[in-house]
């Protein structure tokens, strides 16, 4: 029997993915990491603008190629409280070291037209809490990653107006491994069962953008990314014998994940030859996200699989940043940002422990020579305490506590060649 759900474990962002108030990633390109997304849709300072606003290619001369690498690490550890009735410990730190990469190329055809291509990850989550923690009946190991391939084109009407569009093909990979309680209410001495789910699929969307420059040194950018639907399908691979699990093994399950639409408004303002100020307001449509996970619950009479609605709400970001041209070769970036939470404390899940975040970032771009730039960036994402309280409907098992002092850091580096 086929079952459909919108399943998205995303943002402890990984594999060049990181954690936002929702679960989209801003750490695409090292300069954007150091600025924590400030001015992203208006800067147009390198080919990574393909990800933030394709219209920015109109401001790039000649051919430019950028290759980058990211490393994400952090602390997302659970502390159960006295209300927990499920056995097990607090589990491992859910977030380990996670590498990632990106690639961009832009080419100016003439004074009007520019084309480019980007390959990057801007959506994802990976978490691993181990096989013996108290929340293992909700999640043990889970990941969903989205790799975007984006051919793009930009057209410059005049000195003030530029438009750009990118066609996005996103390949998503979903993996999930979760324990099943084979001894509900502790009536029997049985080890846990387990189910696995894994699939990969393509989804399609578009990036649109415009940049308006009323005067030299001032740019206002507006960018929109469409929703991308990822439809996964696999048969549950259930381990463990017994009547409770036989009905679930091989169950064909369809999972439809929606990567939400977003809108970004940015400002880049050059103050003098050394200083520039940047700002961004961003909206993400998480209220249309739908269901968050597939769960298996058991009691003495049998087993059932159910879906859980995420009860998400839209998120907003405000980011402010500055750039300082210290020397002809060295440009410093700094930024601070706040993201609202996609979920209330009452609706937060163990599968996706997201919340409101503060970001602080810095970085620098150094000109190795006239045609080669080295960029390094760092940011920290502070989530604080994330309380969770979930109860299984059949067994009544309760897992209560919080992810304490949760934080994530990202280190990025990239080289840009200009021809």
For the regions a protein language model found, what residue spans apply to each?
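Outer-membrane beta-barrel pore proteins
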Residues: 40-45, 50-63, 105-112
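Sec-dependent signal peptide recognition
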Residues: 2-8
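Outer-membrane beta-barrel porins/channels
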Residues: 21-36, 40, 83-88, 97-419
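Mid-chain, structured segments of secreted extracytoplasmic proteins
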Residues: 69-97
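Transmembrane beta-strand segments of Gram-negative outer membrane beta-barrel proteins
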Residues: 23-39, 58-77
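Repetitive helical segments and hydrophobic/amphipathic motifs
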Residues: 12-13, 62
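N-terminal signal peptide c-region/cleavage motif recognized by signal peptidases
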Residues: 15-18
